Amino acid sequence: MTLLNIAGGNALIDGRQSARAMMVRKGLQILLQDMRMVSVPELVLSSGRRADLAALSPKGELWVIEIKTSIEDFRVDRKWPEYRAFCDRLFFATHKDVPLDIFPQDCGLFLSDGFGAHVVRDAPEHRLAPAGRKAVTLAFARAAAHRLMLAEWASGRSDDDSSPDEGLGE
């Protein structure tokens, strides 16, 4: 008998995002996967802020991507400049119904349709200091591992069927 359900309905969705934001995120994650990048949604940073999507390249470059689904969403959110301290590149991501000219020119920009995305504008690089890189990379790894554990618990799968190293080094 289950005494406590720690996973809720779906361990991978926290329920704060609108359907439109989830659509943008899905398309963006498909593109990032094609770019051989891995991503963690809603990554809690040491400042206490949550990055909509954090991405890590095979070479260790860290990106923060803020998802904006309307003009109002962009207008009321003024916390995004703080994210520069936690990434090598800062991007926005949106969909076709949001005018692209509202986004700052000194940030990258993605356009997503839920089935994929493309880079409208690349983000300028502002490399993290080594200590900052280590802290954000560790937060990324811990969040990813924790969410994997919750997803496994929610599925009831013990993972006895596969090798513990399956998928590493690809």
Task: Locate each region found by the language model.
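Amphipathic coiled-coil/heptad-repeat helices and related helical stalk/stem segments
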Residues: V24, R49, R75-K79
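Catalytic cores of nucleic-acid endonucleases
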Residues: T69-D113
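Short, flexible loop segments at the rims of nucleotide/cofactor-binding pockets, characterized by
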Residues: E42-V44, E66-D73
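Non-catalytic C-terminal interaction segments of nucleic acid-processing enzymes
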Residues: T2-Q17, M22-V38, S47, I102-E170
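Catalytic cores of RNA-modifying enzymes
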Residues: V40-S46, L56
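Active-site beta-strand-loop-beta-strand hairpin of nuclease catalytic cores
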Residues: A51-V64
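Short beta-strand or tight-loop elements
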Residues: R49-A51, L90
